[in-house]
């Protein structure tokens, strides 16, 4: 560690947010497993938080135990004790540095909704902000913004379902 630091003050809490209500729920659980396996637990206090398909937020205790044992399943289970995001994130932020890593796919995850919640809670997160996330989910709106800024793009035809 630089300057003789023991690294204790360099630790931050990393909330892995995964699962979700979209059709891509299972893909998100697999993504979370791979991120959890790759994160250096010497530098982060990792809190896996799952959202089930009904929208309930839970502390994924089984993932924490499996990670500690070095025996992660192929996909993380998003269930466990209830985890109310706003008060819990406020508590974590008051205790020290915290960042949320949203691993949610599809609507209600990467469309700006979770990013908006985190910004309202004043909690830093990994990834694009509210506007860019919502634009990325609406491909036609994104192309219209690109056109307004004279950015080149492939020809396209917009279809509305």
Regions from the PLM with identified roles:
Residues 1-131, 135-144, 148, 160-161:
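ATP-binding N-terminal substructure of ATP-dependent carboxylate-amine bond-forming enzymes
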Residues 153, 158-161:
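A charged, well-structured terminal subsegment
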């Amino acid at each position: 560690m630089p300057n003789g630091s023991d690294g204790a003050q360099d630790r931050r809490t990393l909330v892995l947010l995964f699962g979700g209500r979209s059709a891509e729920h299972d893909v998100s659980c697999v993504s979370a497993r791979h991120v959890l396996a790759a994160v250096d637990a010497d530098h982060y206090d990792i809190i896996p938080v799952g959202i089930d398909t009904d929208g309930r937020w839970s502390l994924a205790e089984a993932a924490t135990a499996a990670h500690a044992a070095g025996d992660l399943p192929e996909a993380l289970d998003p269930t466990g004790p209830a985890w109310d995001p706003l008060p819990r994130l406020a508590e974590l932020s008051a205790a020290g540095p915290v960042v949320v890593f949203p691993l949610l796919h599809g609507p209600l995850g990467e469309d700006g909704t979770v990013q908006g919640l985190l910004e309202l809670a004043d909690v830093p997160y990994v990834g694009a902000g509210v506007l860019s996330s919502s634009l990325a989910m609406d491909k036609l709106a994104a192309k219209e913004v690109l056109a307004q800024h004279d950015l080149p793009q492939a020809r396209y035809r917009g279809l509305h379902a």
